[in-house]
């Protein structure tokens, strides 16, 4: 219904319309959905991909909304489940790094760690904004059942 209502020249929901090669025809739509969802403390879920046997196409289209911050995408067929989990779950290295940021920030903002607000974790400065971003990645990883492969060790004075 949506594709027809905006008169988009395409028969495939979610794919770029023929002749539109200058960007993403859906960027404004996806960002509008995402901002509305976040404004109302709701999850942003991308719509269906009807070509149920085209798993690579599903991943490509899902990757677009995942990159923007969507929480997931409709799954119409069991063959799309693993693809959705792969696309919307963080990579192991990102999950581990998020957990390290959280542990390091907790330590360095504590009295034992010097009660500081911004600190270095290796070559990276971390602060409250870093902590908030890490919370998002960490929560997604935990929801996906990920286990950490690295641990934070406070420096020995």
Ranges and model annotations:
Residues 1-157:
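Expand to "…catalyze enediolate/carbanion chemistry for C-C bond making/breaking, isomerization
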């Amino acid at each position: 219904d949506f594709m027809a209502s905006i008169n988009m020249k395409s028969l495939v929901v979610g794919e770029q319309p023929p002749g539109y090669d200058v960007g993403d025809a859906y960027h404004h739509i996806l960002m509008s959905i995402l901002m509305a969802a976040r404004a109302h403390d709701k999850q942003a879920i991308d719509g269906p991909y009807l070509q149920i046997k085209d798993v690579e196409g599903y991943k490509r289209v899902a990757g677009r909304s995942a990159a923007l911050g969507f929480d997931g995408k409709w799954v119409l067929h069991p063959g799309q489940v693993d693809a959705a989990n792969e696309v919307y779950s963080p990579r192991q290295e990102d999950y581990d790094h998020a957990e390290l940021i959280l542990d390091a920030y907790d330590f360095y903002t504590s009295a034992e760690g010097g009660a500081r607000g911004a600190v270095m974790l290796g070559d990276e400065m971390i602060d409250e904004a870093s902590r908030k971003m890490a919370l998002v990645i960490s929560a997604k990883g935990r929801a996906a059942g990920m286990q950490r492969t690295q641990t934070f060790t406070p420096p020995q004075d």
